[in-house]
Structures are given as structure tokens and as C-alpha cells.
Amino acid sequence: MARPLLFARSLLFALLIVIATVVWAIGCFGFLLLPYRQRYWMITRWNVFISYAAKYVCGIRWQIKGFENLPDAPVILLSKHQSAWETIFYCWLMPRPMIFVFKKSLLYIPFFGWGLAMLRMIAIDRSRGREAMAQVIETGKRRLNDGQWVIMFPEGTRTPVGSQGKYKNGGAILAIGTDTPVVPIAVNSGDCWPRNAFIKKPGTITVSIGEPISPQGLTASQLMEKVEHWIESEMRVITPGAYA
């Protein structure tokens, strides 16, 4: 596809994001009166809109592998992170309300941050190190006990296509501390929605969901090693050309 057309489609998509974000943010004040699950559902219709706008405007489609591996019980999802796409898509793909761990500064983004503030997410100050981790464990326990799912990106930030970041043990520590299984997820969203790139490229994103891994009898390092091995092996299956 010619670059001018890609730019035009990406520009239209960006405008739709701005309009949808303003509309949903204003609507969020009315959603405050709803019970939490209904409020979550209403707010995450923004995510549905953006996902389908990306599909029909930019040609970004998706396919899901292993959806049947998701248990009917609280879990901690540990996912590869290449793009903003999965942070949008997972909120409405998963059958239970999602709890993201994210940097606190996102709450201060006009309109977008308003919606985040109305959800039971875990906002942390990364500079606080152990104190931030203690907050994740304490709040994560409460959210899991409420039947919600916690999602974390072990590499900590978006990674370029074909690369691998350092897997951190935070999600594994939470899993062991709460005796909650983890579910590894591989996703190749960076092919269509590269990090820090305005241009969105048409294509099909694969989300591959692995089987739950029990934390019982494992150290945090051992558990994360299992997660890392599955995710990185699966990345080479769903995006073989990137790792040639």
C-alpha cells in the first residue's frame, strides 16, 4: 500500500481516537453511578470502538489462539508487549474485568486519564521500587479476591518486533503471594502498530494464549522462566520471519 494512503488512513484513525476519547471521557461521569462491572463494561466500549476503527480504517485484523485456555477463575495474565494495541484489545477480549498495572502519570492525561481513574487499576510510581511492588501485591490480592484478573507485561515496556526485553519477576511474585495461576500470552501487534509510530499498517495480529501455569512449588525466578520460555517460543511460531 502506498505510503500517502497509509498516512491518510492513520490520520483518520488518530482523529477518531481523539473524538471517541473526548466523548467517552465526558460520559464517564454518568457511568460513576453504575455498579462496577457495568461501569467497566460501559467504559471499555471505547476499547471496542478503537479496535474496530483500527480494523476498518487501518486494516488491522486479529485472530485468537488458545482462548479455551482461559480458566473460569481469577488468574494473572503475563503478556508480551509490542504496542498500545493489546492494552486496548485485552480489555474487551477477556471474560472478566481486567486490572492493569501502569505508571501513575497516565492518570494525568486529559480525558483518557479520567476513564482510567474510574476503573480499579493499579497505578504505581516506578521510582519507588520496592514500595511500588508492595502496592502491586497488596492491591492485586484484593482485586483477585474480588474475582477480577490482573494483567502485567513482564518486560515492563513495549519491545520492538523481533526483540526480547528482560523479564522481571513482579508478576511471578504476585502469583506466588496469592497462589494464583499465571497465563502467558504472546502477541505480534508490533507488525501492524509499531511502538512510537504514527503510521499503522494493515495485517493480522495473532494473540496466542497459553495454558495456565501453577506457581506452587516454584520460586519467582523459576515461574518467570517458564513464562518467558513459553512466550518467546510462541513468538517465533506466530512471527517466524522476525526471528530469522
Please give the residue ranges for each predicted region.
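Membrane-interfacial terminal anchoring regions of lipid-handling membrane enzymes
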Residues: M1-L32, R45, E68-L70, Q222-A244
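Non-catalytic C-terminal accessory region of glycerolipid acyltransferases
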Residues: P4, M133-A244
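Catalytic core of membrane glycerolipid acyltransferases/transacylases, capturing the structured
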Residues: T21, A25-V48, K55-V57, N69-G129
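Membrane-helix interfacial anchor on the cytosolic side
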Residues: C58-I60, I64
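Generic preference for hydrophobic
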Residues: I64, L77, F100, V207-I209
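Thr-Gly-centered strand-to-loop micro-motif
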Residues: K65, V101-K103, I124-R126, P154, ...
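Short amphipathic alpha-helix with an adjacent loop that forms part of the alpha/beta core around
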Residues: G66-L70, T139-R142
